[in-house]
Amino acid sequence: MKLHWQKQSSETTRLLLIFSGWSVDWHLFARYDYPAGYDVAVVWDYTVLSNDIFADLRDYDETVVIAWSFGVASFNVLHQSLPSRLNLNCAIAVNGTISPVDDNFGIPENIFSATLSGLSDVSLKGFQRRICGGGNRYKDFKDDLTLCRDDITSLKNQLETFSPEKHRVETWKTAEDKRLWDRAFISTGDLIFPPDNMKNAWNCIGTPIISAEGSHLPDFQHIIDTVVRDKSLIGQQFNSSNKTYEKHAEVQIHAARQLMALWRSATAPAQVLEIGPGSGTLSREIATRYPEAKLTWIDLAETSPSGCNGTFLHGDAEIIVKQLPNEYFDAIFSANSVQWFHSPMRFLINAAKLLKKGGKIALSTFAPGTLNEITEINGGTSLPYLSDNEWQHFAKTAGFETEKIKEEKSVLKFTSGRGLADHLKKTGVNALTKSPRKDNFALMRNLMSRGECTLTFNPLYIILKKQ
């Protein structure tokens, strides 16, 4: 195995670790933009799978893994020996499976065998054209792929590592498999891994699938922008919108109040944790209903909720929840926040540890279809919202019983595109994009050209009980 740093600074606290595919090294990934606050390293050449390559890595608050092609199966083997100091918090699979050569779950065995036996300089070039989806796109990546090229003997040895007799996975439904992978991206035009086989593989363990047009070599920039959260940017955007949030975020305010209306508890919780309190809409609802409860808040924004007394912890909730005492809280609340997390699944697993037996967690988030107007912009990036079924799967994996799950739909109408863009700014909803002004301008221009000014929200309410 080999590792190359694409980006590294002693001041960063997060790591993006990319497991590349066969015959492709770090050169391919030099073209992409990466979010601030992350070191970025690329791993390739899985002839010998060993965690020795990670021995010199320093401590990180959080590590996000994007594994592509044969890198998926490789990381699936390596993750159990990944140093704990890296704090793995998200694993994304891209056009690959944990059983890479399999007639039902990966590359069919006869195709793999033919590729291996016929490997040559000529066939390798043909393979590279296929991963690009054809000659036109291959032209865009030809120079990078040429730089990646290793000698044929070495590439053959690397490929033999994945032969069925050496790398077959039978334990598809183990708890460990279900707790590792957060999402799987599948390109519908993949000419290497059959898309239907990939769907079979990920459906077996309940991993949420995101399907998109494209080839085996996907739009990595879009994937990076979609799944890797720039937490500092999110915090800045919500800090700047804090004073205007309650006046303009009518959908989010309704969702927070509706969540409390759905909450039922036989006894008043003594210790309550709220994640992402923002301006304090839900916080005040909790304090009014349970005036004796001791409240703890975690938020990326720097200001504690107004009108309430409690303990405020400033920072990333996905990191801080790992540092709080187990079985300490009676209830956990979060309104309109968990969609910003890298891993809602791991959050639920950690939340279950914090709750006493029988404790409950109440979440409001958003379902697929939310802000679909933004995703229609050229180059627009939206959050990969989870469906109610995906949330229920993650809840069961984490040890929760689903007490209530309810979805609504709300469409906001604006008299002008400028008003819509202003709404995004004043509510912090545009916190995912790196260039909010540019993205808002594109959104305004797009909607005005169609004569429409709407934003769609699908609030999702979830109440879970620890078993």
Regions found by a protein language model. Name each.
Residues 228-258, 263:
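Class I SAM-dependent methyltransferase Rossmann-like catalytic core
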Residues 273-321:
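Class I SAM-dependent methyltransferase SAM/SAH-binding core
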Residues 362-386:
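Conserved class I S-adenosyl-L-methionine
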Residues 87-118, 380:
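Flexible "cap/lid" loop of the alpha/beta hydrolase fold
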Residues 345-360:
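A short glycine-rich, Lys/Arg-flanked "PGG" loop and its adjoining helix->strand segment in the class I
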Residues 143-166, 174-178, 212-221, 404-467:
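Conserved Class I S-adenosyl-L-methionine
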Residues 322-332:
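A short acidic, Gly/Pro-enriched loop at the edge of an enzyme's catalytic core
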Residues 184-186:
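Short beta-strand/loop motif that positions the catalytic acidic residue
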